[in-house]
Amino acid sequence: MNKFRKKALFSIEKKITWFMFIFMIIGALSTVIFKIQPEKSAIYKDAFNIIKFPVFYICALVLSNGLNKKRLLTSVANRSRIYIMIIFIFSIINIFFEIGMNIDVRYGLRSYKFLFSHSTYLVSSMVIMMCVIIADQHKKSDLIFIIESIIILILTFRNKAFVFVLAYFFEKLMLKYFKKIKLKYIFILGIFGILITYKKIVEVASYGIIAARPALYIVGFKLARDHFPFGAGFGTFASYLSGQYYSPVYDMYSISTVIGLTRDMYDYMADTFWPYIYGQFGFVGFVLFVAAIISIFISIKRRYYLNKKNMLAAFLLFSYILIASTAEAIFTDVTGIFIFMVMATYLGENRIYTKIKNDKNYDNNTIDTRRII
């Protein structure tokens, strides 16, 4: 009897490492050429921060190859159901009573944050738990937990929560009627997301460089243009580290007096992500980074293509990372790293095999690489 030979990585996943390797070389070259950031600690820490997410994703795929992922998924999903029920109960109470679980008032209602320091952390936690339940969904009662999750997300009144809820219904329809999710569907979703948050986008953009977020987007393009084609280098722009080790860039482009971008208060420097990419690594680095992200999309599609529930959960997490990246440095923070690990490990069976023969371990969720590569 021929047994399975577990294969750790697809060729597309190996390409992720190559894209990011070249990306890091670009960062090193621009750092050496322009010598903008004088603090070596900032350079080393920034390099580590940006390489974390592909390293954790690839390592999680490899190291979890021998785990029983179905059992792991069920275990995590059972706990998630309990947490969602508790959080939902308090979300309803928070509507009618002041119980110290809100951060501010939006649309005339309290913005729910539960026990988190900010509602954005509640949003990311709910997204992860909701996706785990979607992947594990085997009872009609699970629909209740999904609905509760959606209500909780809406009650945070965060724009990214609204767009994620839209993504859930949009991608669910795509899988139902088209049987698959393509990259172009994600772009269509992005257009809908822009329409939903258009008023907020216009409001923020109207401030120009006198407000932190639009200033980062605008100056990021100027930085990429002036340091073509490789950008300004590690530790120079649009990251918490560039504030902690205050980068000369903010003085060079006259935004060092903008609230949230000053030497004494630089909390808003990580309120975006993409200016960090094209500002520090230039247009070449931006293309390489996008190529790595597209490769992760293909990786997810190939690993979960046999199971719609798992695929939906994985693509929702992928979509959330893209949504959140417009307003936070999710690719470099703990939340983003954890989401990549969840996609690789906690959404059920996604291992790949090079043989399909009589073996008792084979089931309908095992991926036959001959059918998709």
Predicted feature residues:
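Membrane-interface helix-loop-helix junctions at transmembrane boundaries of multi-pass membrane enzymes
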Residues: 3-17, 135-144, 179-182, 297-315
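Aromatic-anchored transmembrane helix interface
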Residues: 15-31, 38-65
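Alpha-helical transmembrane segments of multi-pass inner-membrane proteins
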Residues: 74-102, 117-175
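Long extracytoplasmic/lumenal interhelical loops at the membrane interface
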Residues: 204-211, 215-218, 233-281
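Transmembrane alpha-helices of multi-pass inner-membrane enzymes
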Residues: 315-373
